Amino acid sequence: MDSITHLFLGGAIVAAIVPARHRRAALLAGAALNTLPDLDVFPLALCDDPIVRMTWHRGATHSWLVLPFVAWAIWAWFRGRGGRVAEAPTRWWWAILACLMAHPLIDAFTVYGTQLFWPLPMPPLMWSSLFIIDPLFTLPWLLACVVAWCARERILAQRALLAGITLGIAYVGWSLLAKSLVERAARPALVALGLRDAPSFSVPLPFNTLLWRVVAMTPDGFVEGERSLVADHGPMVFHAHASDTQALDAVSQLPAVVRVLWFNHHFAKAQVRDGTLVLSDLRMGSEPDYSFNFAVATRTGNRWQALRPPRQLPFVWKSRPGLDALWSRIWNQPPPTQ
């Protein structure tokens, strides 16, 4: 999730667990702790390989096999210094642990991919029921923290924190229900296209859980469809798009290609632009605009030569037209008739 959400989520969790007399300090401590796993972006920024930067983010710093040791080290250091942690060590231990573990857990509900069990050799988890920025998910945590800060040690603060946590969890539950409804609507259309067993995923479009995008892979590319839980009631419509699967097969053993396909579960589009092979991550964006596009190889005669390092191509999202179209599509526009 975005950094602002993590600030308030962490603050609410820690403040709800520690003694009331520590509440304001806990709000600040939780905000700092829940930001900690994302600090991996700073050392990764020193790397000139964009695929390394992408695929190592949400790795070791987001691992449930690593974070308990980090939590213990932080807790032990502060307990040794006295102060609030030494006054209530048990509560602070559970608060620190819960805060750090919650960060990668909520990240796993986005489509980016979180290596929750690093260093085990398994692809990143992407439950993809939440967009990385969702104001309605952020709001309960924000309001809970504001009320708790103002109410301090009063019972109102604890009630606000518990209400905020409950609403936040309920929103995640709703997102999973919405995802299941979309996938149920998509299934008959995919079966009709002969794609019953094709690799596929669904993901909410920006800032909401009412409008969704579904992608399924085909032998020569992929199909893509949208579903509004408000406006759409008929059969789901998919549009076919090509991918240069022959070129992708030719470079499939290149280390950068192996890494990025492992990371995105092979949900990738390949296209040749001016003799350069570009891989686009189908999970983030929509046809033809994707957030992550990597130039991985150049063609010399009949052979492909790896680019070292790969290049990340710029992505520009036209926010105002995009938001207007998104809002309209949620409420009004049914899928076009083929």
What are these regions (language model features)?
Residues P204-F207, L211:
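ATP/pyrophosphate-binding catalytic subdomain of soluble kinases
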Residues R196-P199, L211-Q338:
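Extracytosolic and intramembrane catalytic regions of membrane-associated proteins
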Residues M1-P204:
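N-terminal membrane-targeting hydrophobic helices
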